[in-house]
Amino acid sequence: MERLLVLKLDAVDCEAEASLNGVPLARVDAARPSCIVPIHEYAIAGPNELGLVIWPRPAITPASPPLPAEARVADGKRMAQLRILLPRIGSVAEESTARTLAQLDWAPPDGDSYEAPLALSQSFGLPVNFPRWRWLEAPVIEDTPTLRAQALKVVKELATDLAAGQPARFLAATRLRTEEIALAYQRRPEDETERLRERLLALHAEGRLTWRPVTPEALFLRSMAEGRLLECLGADGGPVLTTEPDGQGRSVALPLRVTAVEGRLYVLR
């Protein structure tokens, strides 16, 4: 692979969230004003939908009742830039050194009124063909008490096994995701699986897999990809499978974006 398709999001004095094909991939704010993420596993053949939300709701905002929009006035300084870039492997992902395939900009002049959250979108094509990912064929699912209980059980089992230095259940649960990520980045699935296994075992050996408590109150399911995926989040809006900080303040987070088919959960992203 000579080039890497990435999403680059920058913001000044505001919060912003970027999505691709309905899946939120990057969020920035004053503390973290820039973010770059590879996006092969979320790109599709044909038209792709790029989304940018200014002042997004918290990730765990309840779907109902809907919160009212907030009236705001631009100060001429706040801005956000979203780019899809195609840099060469090893090169810096900057507009000056990479091909720009799509972009969204928000920079209202001083005094302009707007309502937040403010959503912008753009459709664009890609010069690369991607497979038809499984999540595109997943059924639309709803966050129900039964599904929430099932997700809680799965996450608790994964956390227990990983904390004991036993990654087999996690590797099996994420097999479909691992296979597609390997395909997306032209790697071998078995190599990707082994890399993940070694990483998890190394973290356990370092004593870094003490997970935050996984409780019903700490699990939230965020709908995305037009309802085809549910992301398992904790009370802070990050992945529910997140460790307690170690002595250096480092945490490990393992995102889980799942679907449900015939009563069984599958981790697809």
Predicted regions and their residues:
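Accessory beta-strand-rich segments of carbohydrate-active enzymes
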Residues: R3-T61
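Beta-strand-rich recognition domains
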Residues: M1-A16, V53-R269
